[in-house]
């Protein structure tokens, strides 16, 4: 399945919210990301996509300094308003070492909201580049990655998730969400299988 998708459709790698502030705000997320070794794995995937001339897209959250467009309608939004985390231009909002955007990469950022298709140019950007398959990596397997996967399927993309390139705050919850939720809408695979399928 993955070989057919990556061999017959144009794919893009989407690196979601791999930012310093996420791991500062949520230490358990940082610990899981480190334990699972997702940063070097994502870096390898990104290098493979770039080598094939395929798009690498970063989807960070970078809040406006006055936080005016962050509505207190969820626990995460309330936490952002309380901590003033991930403000554009601050260290919190910057990318983790090794996953900074390269000159030919794309960045589709948002200042509020839960997932990267909402309130951004991501869908239009993908359409204009002729992308049909999206490969999702980054954080978190609890919220951001499922949100991207559901929206991606609704927008008629094929969705691939290398499970060893995503992380959440708890491994047990991660496993349940991958098995009971993500696999229903996405092809679950590994970094090595994606690289092999790229050829």
Task: Give the residues covered by each predicted segment.
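Catalytic metal-binding/acid-base residues of hydrolase active sites
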Residues: 19, 62-63, 140, 166
